[in-house]
From Swiss-Prot:
Residues 14-33 have a biased composition (Low complexity). Residues 1-13 have a biased composition (Polar residues). Residues 1-33 are annotated as: Disordered. This is Protein sigN132. Coiled coil: none annotated. Disulfide bonds: none annotated.
Length: 76
């Protein structure tokens, strides 16, 4: 599980948006920084996180971030 999560994080930035959507869940509207917002947790998400601030590197890497969209991201 731990190694799987590390692999997911290391591969996240190189993943296309379509593959991220397929592996992570449904999407809602995009933020001003084009960060994809996830409204569903599928495929092993532990719990939903609500993002309230934008730090692109941290949000995308750690929580597949929603930025300012106010949506729900999945922590892995």
């Amino acid at each position: 599980m731990l190694f799987e999560s590390i692999s997911t994080l290391s591969n996240l930035k190189s993943a296309s948006k379509s593959s991220m959507i397929a592996s992570t869940g449904s999407t809602s509207s995009k933020s001003s920084n084009s960060i994809q917002c996830y409204t569903g947790c599928v495929g092993g998400g532990i719990f939903p996180i609500r993002q309230t601030s934008i730090n692109i590197d941290i949000n995308i890497s750690i929580s597949r971030g929603c930025g300012s969209c106010g949506g729900c991201a999945c922590r892995y």
